[in-house]
Amino acid sequence: MEFFDENLPKNGDTVVVGLSGGVDSTLTALLLQKKGCKVIGVTMSLWDGRVPENLGDKVLKPSCYSPSEVTNIEECAKFCKENNIEYHVVDVKKEYNDCVLEYFKAEYRSGRTPNPCIQCNRFVKFGALLEGIKKLNIEYDYFCTGHYAKIVRPAEGLWGTDVHPCMISSAIDQSKDQTYFLYKIPSEILEKVRFPLASMSKKEVFELAHQFKLEAANREESQDFI
């Protein structure tokens, strides 16, 4: 079956970008702004402090769910202020606890291997976060993130119908491809989702980030979960 890549945001579009403080999301926001889009940055607030920061001789490493969230938000706010980008923090702690942490514990106790990132993307990042944006009365054309994946649409209708739903497809950089973590996102959500880094390699992302002198280019790559 033949598939067509969906168009990326264009000059004049209003785009909400999910910012984590990392190089991928930061560069995504900057590239869209330079393209002429009105960019609005949003960050999820997940950390509730329930896990001790010091566990004997071990310390929680920086990750999406950790005390480093405070620093991440500060860096996102600084980046947005420097680049004249509207910025919001959306509290999704309850949804993260219910859909990710409780799921993780239940799977682990049942002897199964959990995948918290799939749950988070399906129910939090592309679920609760978008609901939070709606509650802020933010209107937008697209929601973008720095994921390495792309949105495609089948040329022919599925199952002999005229239905041509948006789907997740592999990014150019196979070593960073994240389609596995995104595959549960419903097609109706994907209609307004775009991944501007789909055609770039991680090497190109870092090169551009250094060229634009982004502080995020000097950070270590983010780690999933805790």
Name each model feature, range by range.
Residues 1-184, 194, 202-205, 210-211:
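ATP-dependent adenylation/nucleotidyltransferase module used to activate substrates
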Residues 198, 203-226:
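Anionic-ligand-binding alpha/beta catalytic cores of soluble enzymes and soluble regulatory domains
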Residues 188-192:
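A short, charged helix-loop
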